[in-house]
Amino acid sequence: MTPAELFGEGINLMLSGMGFVITFLLILIWAITTMSKLINRFFPEPVKQSKPSQKPTALSAAVQGNDLDRLRPVIVAAIAHHRRSQGLN
């Protein structure tokens, strides 16, 4: 075989391989989409009942503020530890 024939066979093999891969991927996408639609049709997600929204009260705001006050020293210590370990201070 001449180099031109070998090159032509290589191109032919490459294109047929790419065609098979694209065909397989398209079939795979179609199968996954079809299975998803079937599962959603026969096993729909239950509809959750929405609870009436509760307005934040003074107590919940105080608890959130208290959480921030408790976490502030922890955050400062973590930042200081990180800076020490990185040699930034």
UniProtKB/Swiss-Prot annotation:
The keyword Transmembrane applies. The keyword Coiled coil does not apply. Keywords: Cell membrane, Ion transport, Membrane, Sodium, Sodium transport, Translocase, Transmembrane, Transmembrane helix, Transport. It is an enzyme of class 7 (translocase). One of its GO terms (molecular function) is sodium ion transmembrane transporter activity. It is a single-pass membrane protein. Belongs to the OadG family. Catalyzes the decarboxylation of oxaloacetate coupled to Na(+) translocation. This is Probable oxaloacetate decarboxylase gamma chain. It comes from Actinobacillus succinogenes (strain ATCC 55618 / DSM 22257 / CCUG 43843 / 130Z). The lineage of its organism: Bacteria, Pseudomonadati, Pseudomonadota, Gammaproteobacteria, Pasteurellales.
